Amino acid sequence: MNPRLDLLQPYPFEQLRTLLAGAVPPAALRHIPLSIGEPRHAPPAFISEALVRALDHSLGSYPVALGLPQLREAIARWLERRFHLPVQAVRADDMVLPVNGTREALFSFVQAAVDAESAARGSRPLVLMPNPFYQIYEGPALLAGAEPRFLNCTESNGYLPDLDAVDAATWNRCQVLFLCTPGNPTGAVMPDAYLRRALELSARHGFVIASDECYSELYFDEASPPIGLLQAAFEAGNTTFERCAVFHSLSKRSSVPGLRSGFVAGDARFLTRYRLYRTYHGCAVPVHTQLASLPAWNDEAHVVENRRLYREKFVRVTPVVADALQQDIAIPAGGFYLWPRVADDQAFTRGLFARQHVTVLPGRYLARETESGNPGLGRIRISLVASVDDCDEAARRIAEFARQPRH
């Protein structure tokens, strides 16, 4: 077996199961799970209908790694509309690659991007990432022979990795920089100046920027959608998106996490090599999935409604949780998480489950210990993915639990 498998840490939800083992919540209280970021809004009917229609004529042939040309075209035009790029700025034939959701793509991308042989030349490659982070950034880095390097995201730095705190020697060893905007779990959005700084560092030191933008369509202010890496690159004069790759998904945007559909877009030179890797990796997106994805990228009305529902939940839940935990909690710029402070994230999570049958996630499970500490310690992640009524009820139970004496 690959000895690097021993480097992988237990996944957050495995740790959560261990933490909650043996806890017996009140049987009279229905379980409200707010731990996993799995959208539970009803999927748009037109996506389901397109999927059913596609099944009638798509199961008799293998999908190709490149993806359907009409889907690549739809994605390219969506990127241009959404991020204010000129028409044909994104070439559908070599700048867009459909994938089976961002999780699969983030993993395989690192395998293609990391030059593990550089370790034999005396310099183990680095993959830099925010901390806390989506765990799929760390695992593939370890399996590719790279060393993960964690950049703490705290309230003091606006929950954005401090790029200027990284020394030149570290940047010279960096092969991939992961960004996540809006951030998971903080919801922080990277402004144009921040992305331009990342682009400057990438040009100087030669690393690839992998920007996870799967929450880009979940934002609070309809008048201010988050900027993306390709938009920042184009406006900075990098019109071919050199050393840039963005990852988008329908899971959050369209509430279809079970469809497993997304895309990678950016640097054509790199995507050509990445496509070669995927040809052998054997992970082409099924044709029926692609055909169901096509209308999803062409429609915005259902996404606007999605945002309305999340906005309503934030407005209703945030003040209740803030009052219960006796702290100021700002509604995040994007995403669907709250990231409040608690005295002990593990004890709070277990107690809340045992007494109120509500599941949240300890913040420490989403982060790693660094010289300056674990930025998830003393935080919990609350995923506002349930219905509005369930989120209201969960907030009420959190408030009741917070008022109860601890034993």
Residue spans for each PLM region:
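Conserved core of the PLP fold type I
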Residues: 59-200, 217-218, 222-238
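PLP-dependent enzyme catalytic core of the Aspartate aminotransferase-like
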Residues: 77-81, 85, 239-240, 354-359, ...
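Conserved glycine-rich beta-strand-loop-beta hairpin in the small C-terminal domain of fold type I
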Residues: 290, 294, 309-318, 328-342, ...
